[in-house]
Amino acid sequence: MNSIADINPTIAGSIEQAEAIRGSMQMKLDEMRRAYHQDPNPSEAERKHHLKQLKKLIGENTEAISKAISEDYGHRSEHETMFAEFIGTGGGIDDILKNLRKWMKPEKRHIDSTMFPFASNTVIPQPLGVVGLIVPWNFPVFLSVSQIAIAFAAGNRVMVKMSENSRSLTRLLRELSPKYLPEDKLVFIEETGGVGIEFSKLAFDLIIFTGSGATGRKVMASAAENLTPVILELGGKSPAIIDPDYDLAKAAERIMFAKQFNAGQICVNVDYVMVHKSQLDEFIDHCTAWLKTNVPTINSD
């Protein structure tokens, strides 16, 4: 099996090394595509096996993964990591396993009999091939594994480009992944400087990106060179609108919890609040009181 070289293009010979890692990624993509052509439509049993192996990967290495995430963060509570990264991820895989057979079945569709008399129409779900997944740092396990699971359910292979801020986790996943899944099914790539844009220039069959609008535009422009379809989940400015009749203390509690969870680094977190002018001071007082009780010092959460 070919492996992705761990190259840092910020040191001497950066141009040559950047070209080397681009070539390495292309070789891995070619290998995964050959494997796809040999097995273009995995059976239900194959897909379930891959999903179960993916769940085992995170389930059997929870402690090591939590430690790696904490190293990348500088510090992150293991309880927060358990809640944010593992519970929803494992439950999501279980849900896919439960529904996979139904999702794989062909479905009849209506057809205009005046245009196509005596014809029938059936939609047959088919894998796309090799999916390129670009993952941010804020929920690195949930936003990688949950989307890998979806791609596996659809019969695809996945190449994952992790964030430059998730180096410890990425190295761990690169070490663990081959023990559970073939390298022509799943591979993790570490961001070593400039890899992200080059990654999105590869001729994947689909690119999934989670991150900022500015970077999303660059990813989409790069993907357009190959007419690669993209799925973009981009951060925005999410409001919280408080009805004047709603319990103001409860609203403040829920909003402040969301703003403090994961240090507020959530794609759809509340960015601003719309509150009746007459209630503004009271709302601020409730927010301040919540913070003093739950986060009395900067390192107390």
What are these regions (language model features)?
Residues N2-N121:
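N-terminal Rossmann-like NAD(P)+-binding subdomain of aldehyde/semialdehyde dehydrogenases
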Residues I11, Q17-E19, A214-D301:
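ALDH superfamily catalytic-core signature
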Residues R34-P40, L133, I241-I242, Y272-V275:
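Short, well-ordered beta-strand elements within core beta-sheets of diverse protein domains
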Residues Y36, P40, K55-I58, T62, ...:
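Structural signal for hydrophobic packing residues in well-ordered secondary-structure cores
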Residues G88, V123-Q126, C267:
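A generic fold-level signal
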Residues D112-K250:
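Rossmann-like NAD(P) dinucleotide-binding subdomain of oxidoreductase/dehydrogenase enzymes
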